[in-house]
Amino acid sequence: MLLSQNVSAIGPLNLYPMVHISLVFGISYVVPDLSDESCTLKMRFRNFQSILSWELKNRSIVPTHYTLWYTIMSKPEDMKVVKDCINITRSFCDLTDVWVNRTDMYISQVVGYRENAVVVSCMGSFFLASDKPLDPPKFEIVDFTNNISVNVKFRLDSPRIPSEELQFYLAFIEEHAGNSVKRHQPQITGNITENFNYVIDKLIPNTNYCISVYFEPKDPRKINRSPLKCILFRPRRESESSEPATIGGILILFLLAAVCISTVMILKRIGYICLRNDFPEALNFYKLSVWVFPELPPLEKMATVEVIHITRKKKEWNYNYDDESDIENEVAPRVNSGGYTKHGLTGRLCPTSTTAASLEDCSLEDCSLEDCSDPSAEEPYLPEPKRDAETPAAPGPGPWQSEGTGGGYQTRGTLWQDPTSEEDSDSTEGSEGRIVFNVNLNSVCVRALEDDKDSEVTLMSPSPPEETAVLEEDLSETESSLLVASEEGTQLPFTDPSMECLRPQDALSDKSDTSESDVDIGDGYIVRQVNLKNFN
């Protein structure tokens, strides 16, 4: 704030009493106006420089040049001219190096000349401690991570002012944050250098702060504040805050994607997009929804299964090839102690003198006895027309055997012709009185009856010792059950199944002479060829 003082020209002798009063009471003395007020004197203190300026009241009188005089009131001295302010054309003068004592009162006189004539003369008195306000210094503010630094600058050519006096003038740094104002009073000790730094901390992030620096004089009404300098305080720099910005961007993108997907799915559900079931692949989010919300696996289908055990009775066959009757003569099965059942097989031999018709009738009669129900027997067995002897019934396995292992029958006793017999069909010697059948060596025991009645039973397959004992016990019983084929035809019984083998008897009668030859065809079977002589 500038101080203006109206001065008038007075004599040096009249100033001494006023100087004494000014020093005692410490007040500024205003020199009484002893002449007409032709100009106004002003003292300024800018950047530690004392500038005295003047302004003319009567603008019609314009001096061409000025000269400045001064004296100290406490010293009985005459007026002295200021060397740098003689015959100057400007309306101010720098008294920084002239007025150095701040406790003295200085009396100044400005004289204006036009050519060599004095046209204006003005006087004034100033007490530097109170009448010279200080202009605010230059400063800068810098923001850091958590504070603000205020850098106050002083000129190198500053006046020679002691540090104690500078502490008196350097007052406050004001901090403006919104509507609040906070003053900081720095503590200065020692000599003052070019710059002075002051740190302001405990700041609120993302807040705009304004700083002002000024010197406070004794009169509060004369404070001259500097212009405000503002800065936005950020606790972190932009480089450090890049990571939160990235995370925020990712979250925003994720939310936008979720909103878009949910919108499309809702439009699909309500049928707004399209009304067909085969959607394009771009709009098919079923798999994506399964990944986010997995569905429970479907329940297993269960059905009740009822197991029904069917008990089937074994069909017993009584093969009877009698000419007089086609009815099966059932023979009561004999149950052995081992739980097996004996079955007899009635075999019929074709007559000696046979013709093609008689042989055909014989084969048809055999088929009628068997009901021709065996699916494996595709063609009926037709005996060769040159056979002269009746073929005796050959023993075969019982009906409990699933495989067709019967001697001359297929599965249920039907005779079948071995390929080997077809090869020998051209020879009259091998085709007469011969029957071809298979024997399972794993389950059949064969006893061949030769001319000697004392021949022993020959076992064709091994059997355990227990089964051999049972075989010997039932030997007599088996021999009694064997029947010899006669003209009417007899029944050839099977052996006991508990023996796990069959013992066929090949002796048909005393008049029949048999010769046997066996051929192994693999799979545990043997082809037996029996040569039969013609019966009388």
Curated annotation (Swiss-Prot):
Modified residues (Phosphoserine): S480
GO cellular component: plasma membrane
Pfam families, per the entry: Interfer-bind, Tissue_fac
GO molecular function, one term: interleukin-22 receptor activity
Tissue specificity: Expressed in the endometrium. Expressed in all tissues examined except conceptus at day 15 of pregnancy.
Region of interest: Mediates interaction with STAT2 (and required for the recruitment of USP18): 432-456
3 X 5 AA tandem repeats of S-L-E-D-C: region residues: 358-372
Domain of life of the native organism: Eukaryota
Keyword annotations: Cell membrane, Disulfide bond, Glycoprotein, Membrane, Phosphoprotein, Receptor, Repeat, Signal, Transmembrane, Transmembrane helix
Record's keyword annotation contains Membrane: yes
Glycosylation sites: N58, N87, N101, N147, N191
Compositional bias ranges of the Acidic residues kind: 420-429
Signal peptide interval: 1-26
Residues in Sequence repeats: 358-362, 363-367, 368-372
Topological domains, Extracellular: 27-246
Record PTM: Phosphorylated on tyrosine residues upon interferon binding. Phosphorylation at Tyr-340 or Tyr-525 are sufficient to mediate interferon dependent activation of STAT1, STAT2 and STAT3 leading to antiproliferative effects on many different cell types.
GO biological process entries: defense response to virus; response to interferon-alpha; response to interferon-beta; type I interferon-mediated signaling pathway
Transmembrane residue ranges: 247-267
Disulfide bonds: C39-C122, C85-C93, C210-C230
Entry-linked SUPFAM superfamilies: Fibronectin type III
Spans within the Cytoplasmic topological domain: 268-536
Annotated positions of the Phosphotyrosine modification: Y340, Y525
Membrane disposition: Single-pass type I membrane protein
Subunit and interaction comment: Heterodimer with IFNAR1; forming the receptor for type I interferon. Interacts with the transcriptional factors STAT1 and STAT2. Interacts with JAK1. Interacts with USP18; indirectly via STAT2, it negatively regulates the assembly of the ternary interferon-IFNAR1-IFNAR2 complex and therefore type I interferon signaling.
Task of the protein: Together with IFNAR1, forms the heterodimeric receptor for type I interferons (including interferons alpha, beta, epsilon, omega and kappa). Type I interferon binding activates the JAK-STAT signaling cascade, resulting in transcriptional activation or repression of interferon-regulated genes that encode the effectors of the interferon response. Mechanistically, type I interferon-binding brings the IFNAR1 and IFNAR2 subunits into close proximity with one another, driving their associated Janus kinases (JAKs) (TYK2 bound to IFNAR1 and JAK1 bound to IFNAR2) to cross-phosphorylate one another.
Designated name of the protein: Interferon alpha/beta receptor 2
Source organism: Ovis aries
Lineage of producing organism: Eukaryota, Metazoa, Chordata, Craniata, Vertebrata
